[in-house]
């Protein structure tokens, strides 16, 4: 089937995602950095925050307890992490070029609702997407097949006519198991080249 739709992840694809760099900037001590990584960003509870099972305020209190940081320092760290989500210029150009080519664009991201609300006010390129699925808004999260089913049910897109782009292998595998074509994102240029395999007239 011809590809009509492209479904993008956000963190690590459209926007930079590098928590260790943010942690190191705010907390120079290596031992503290390790605790924050392990007890916050790499912990299953961060996944739950992404899923919407923890509100923003509850997450601040919770991660202050697990990391030993003050609530003010935890709040500052989460805010700094949001601020660090800068656009990846080559991917933004790719989105703009796909939109001009008539490809239907969708978003499917693991992200707290409050973080997405912060980002959508900052970046105009989100307007290129016809429908946006944010895990924290619907209590579903990749790689659960249910979040892909949610996208299909809400939009009516055909998975076999859609290519999903994500930086994490487990999410790429999940998308393929749900019938989508899929590309593991490494950088904008290789992603563009991979898309040409699905969209021969796209440059």
Where are the regions a protein language model picked out?
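Asp-based, Mg2+/Mn2+-dependent phosphohydrolase catalytic module
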Residues: 1-6, 112-113, 117-203
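Active-site neighborhood of HAD-like aspartate-dependent phosphohydrolases
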Residues: 1-42, 66, 177-178
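Short beta-strand segments
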Residues: 16, 106-110
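Alpha-helical elements of Rossmann-like donor-binding domains used by nucleotide-donor carbohydrate transfer enzymes
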Residues: 21-22, 44, 58, 62, ...
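Metal-dependent phosphoesterase signature
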Residues: 49-90
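Short, acidic loop-to-helix structural element flanking the phosphoryl-transfer center
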Residues: 75-106, 117, 145
């Amino acid at each position: 089937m011809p590809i009509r739709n492209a479904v993008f992840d956000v963190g690590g694809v459209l926007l930079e995602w590098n928590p260790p760099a943010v942690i190191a900037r705010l907390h120079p001590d290596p031992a503290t950095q390790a605790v924050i990584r392990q007890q916050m960003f790499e912990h299953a509870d961060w996944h739950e925050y992404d899923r919407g099972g923890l509100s923003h305020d509850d997450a601040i209190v919770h991660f202050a307890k697990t990391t030993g940081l003050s609530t003010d320092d935890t709040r500052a760290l989460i805010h700094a992490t949001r601020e660090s989500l800068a656009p990846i210029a080559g991917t933004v150009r790719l989105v703009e070029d796909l939109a001009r080519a008539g490809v239907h664009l969708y978003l499917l991201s693991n992200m707290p609702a409050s973080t997405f609300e912060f980002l959508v006010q900052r970046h105009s390129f989100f307007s290129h997407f016809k429908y946006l699925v944010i895990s924290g808004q619907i209590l579903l999260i990749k790689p659960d097949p249910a979040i892909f089913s949610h996208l299909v049910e809400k939009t009516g897109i055909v998975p076999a006519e859609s290519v999903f782009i994500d930086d994490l292998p487990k999410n790429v595998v999940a998308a393929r198991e749900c019938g989508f074509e899929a590309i593991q994102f490494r950088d904008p240029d290789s992603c563009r080249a991979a898309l040409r395999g699905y969209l021969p007239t796209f440059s």
